[in-house]
Structure formats: structure tokens, C-alpha cells
Regions:
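C-terminal motif of bacterial Sec signal peptides marking the signal peptidase cleavage site
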Residues: 21-24
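Bacterial N-terminal signal peptides that target proteins for export
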Residues: 2-14
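N-terminal intrinsically disordered, low-complexity segments enriched in P/E/S/T
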Residues: 26-194
């Protein structure tokens, strides 16, 4: 009887040790791959006074913003946008079905810089060809959406969707592409926040 109890305890202990070892070695406990890589830290941060742009203005921001550097708006050149800090990630472009590495600031960092209040719900993004799309701010806050200025290490000219475009991390999250493909606005010239 004593031998059976000892054998039973030894088997139970072996099973527990085996389960612990398997769980410890499983990929679920591995360090997750980061969604994006930080390329540069912010030099222009939320709460800072916005300087006047020194280069060509590529973005005008209006609406529910808590700061301005223009008459009733924010105007930004490429250097200002990049000074918010840049990240990059690889994503399969839904329009070209090809992987690209996009780089630019996170839209959430831009919203913070612009002092967008909690009562704002929508970004109305306007492109150079007057394409307009309304993007929920909740999605901008939930996902690491890029205000991309570069594609595969090159600034995007207007002829290839520049100077800027919104990029969603399709490779890392499940998106309803019927809805979200419309949010991939490019040739962005203005954003109105409501």
C-alpha cells in the first residue's frame, strides 16, 4: 500500500513538472515581437509650443485642437512632423498586395501634440485630389496607426502617394478591410478634427 502511494505521488509530481516545463517552453511565453520599431525619439512633444514651419507646409490641421501655430490652425512641414518622433513597421499594402516598411510618427502622438480633447471623435482626412475620409479617433488611439512619410526608406513623392499617408498595422491586427481600406488615405494635405 505504501509503495502504491509513493508511486502515485511520483507519477503526479512527474506530470506536474512536465506540464510546467512544457508551459515554460511554449511560444506563448516568448517575448512578443514588437509591432513597430522606434527610429527617433520625440523632440517636439505634447505640451510644447508649436514653432512656425520653416519648410514647405505639407499638412494643415483644423477643428477641435487645443494649440495653434497659425491663425486658427496648425501648419506643419516635414521636419516638424518628423520631430514628433518616428517609428516604422512592415505591413502588406492592401492596394499593391506587397510588403513595405513605412516610417513616420504615430498618429496618436500627433493627436497628443495637437491637444485633441476627449470630446473629439473623428478625423476628416483630405487628400490633394480632394478625396475625403472620416476616420474614428478611437481607432487612431487603439492601434499604432502611422502618419507615414517614407516607404522602404524613401520619402514618398506625390506621384507615389506622398507626401504622407495613413497606414494601419494590417499584419498585426484583424481589420475589416472593407471598412479600413478606405482609411488608408494618401497624398494627405489636411486634417479636420471634430
Amino acid at each position: 500500500m505504501l509503495i502504491r502511494k509513493l508511486i502515485s505521488r511520483a507519477i503526479t509530481a512527474s506530470v506536474i513538472i512536465g506540464v510546467v516545463l512544457i508551459a515554460a517552453c511554449s511560444p506563448n511565453n516568448a517575448t512578443p515581437t514588437p509591432i513597430y520599431q522606434r527610429i527617433s525619439d520625440a523632440k517636439l512633444k505634447a505640451g510644447d509650443t508649436l514653432p512656425a514651419p520653416t519648410g514647405d507646409i505639407i499638412l494643415t490641421v483644423t477643428g477641435k485642437i487645443g494649440t495653434k501655430n497659425g491663425a486658427d490652425n496648425i501648419v506643419m512641414d516635414r521636419d516638424m512632423i518628423e520631430s514628433v518622433g518616428q517609428v516604422e513597421y512592415k505591413v502588406t499594402d492592401p492596394f499593391e498586395t506587397k510588403d513595405y516598411v513605412y516610417r513616420g510618427p504615430l498618429m496618436s502622438d500627433l493627436l497628443d501634440l495637437w491637444k485633441v480633447g476627449s470630446d473629439a471623435t473623428t478625423l476628416q482626412v483630405v487628400a490633394l485630389d480632394d478625396y475625403v475620409v472620416k476616420v474614428p479617433i478611437a481607432d487612431i488611439r487603439k492601434y499604432p496607426v502611422l502618419f507615414a512619410l517614407q516607404q522602404d526608406g524613401q520619402y514618398m513623392p506625390v506621384s507615389t502617394r506622398g507626401p504622407a499617408m495613413l497606414v494601419f498595422p494590417y499584419n498585426n491586427f484583424e481589420f475589416n478591410q472593407t471598412v479600413y481600406n478606405d482609411y488608408w488615405a494618401w497624398q494627405i494635405k489636411a486634417i479636420d478634427i471634430s
